[in-house]
Amino acid sequence: MAVSKLPVRSCLIDGEAIVCDENGLAVYELICRHDAGERAVLSAFDLLEPDGKDLRRRPIEKRKELLAQLLNGRKSISFFGEDGEIVFREACKLGCEGIVSKRLGSIYRSGRSPLWLKVKNPNAPTVKREAEEDWGR
């Protein structure tokens, strides 16, 4: 769905442009290719400001609910309320780069927050490459 098709005049969404491989996994190297634009999609994480209404102080659960309504059932990022360790193990089995865990009830803050935790899959190709590059420095 094109952003211009959303039922708002303006909107601030936290998300990431991704390109998926044939298995449906986001692959960093694919977004870097010159022809990525045709295959790139926005993976929306959070709704911050629809039509000028600042939602950043609202709890994450409410922002996710409003994001789902805005996208009207269209695919976005997956949200789970289950135990983070279980979700992480399953994400690793699928070959995902990792997960971001956000504490229920948290408000939106730019930058890093102790209420939001990014956990990387040590076996994901992108993470292995990052580790190798860091080791060489």
Say what each PLM segment does.
Residues 1-137:
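Catalytic cores of nucleic-acid ligases and guanylyltransferases
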